Amino acid sequence: MAGKKAAKVPRDTYERELLRLQTELVRLQEWVRSEGARLVVVFEGRDAAGKGGTIKRVTEHLNPRVARIAALPKPTERERTQWYFQRYVEHLPAAGEIVLFDRSWYNRAGVEHVMGFCTGKEHQLFLRQCPVFERMLLEDGILLRKYWFSVSDAEQQERFRRRLEDPVRRWKLSPMDLESITRWEAYSRAKDEMLVHTDIAEAPWYVVESDDKRRARLNMIAHLLATVPYHEVPPPVLELPERPPSTGYERPPRDLRTYVPDHAASL
């Protein structure tokens, strides 16, 4: 990162602003649903750059029937014989939907290229076709936002170390993650080449500096909200009805049901 390193965002400031932004995300969601809009948000970046944590905060208060996450596994043997973009197309949103890609078709420009999972010819074909593919999405009316989460090598190393020592997050660390440490510069070159070919005027890349996770989350969400032309949709007027009087119903005896043990009482 260039320039003086910014101070970390205090927790109380972060939580207050995050809640405000999440409230706006709900308004964005209701606009998407009301207008029949289609929104695609691409999250890319190195391992441990903060993509997943940001996605979690984006979707925390959203309706999963409107906003969903697409995190595709490695392609099957059948998918490997298809047009490269084909398996991503089926995850694109219909009217009134938001799709967040936790990694995306840009796998071919990054991990597949660096790790040798695709040929040089396939990689170059991707770089040529990707802008065309994205322009097709835009011409069809899809709103597309692409974010690259940029983490320093020192911060990535520290996050890997914490994952290694944390039994709750240990599953996040894979042999591929560890391999990325020794291929840092190869990934850097791949990222630079990707940006040269795919940072197009119609669908630019937005870089999120992410050594400070709180700052990265706030900055990314605020930018998304600022670049989508949504407006507040008045919610329907709802009133709670009065509960009707009992008609004599009685619950069956408790011993006829199997209840989970009260583990909390033992704490």
Locate the predicted segments by residue.
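Glycine-rich phosphate-binding loop of ATP-dependent small-molecule kinases
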Residues: 1-267
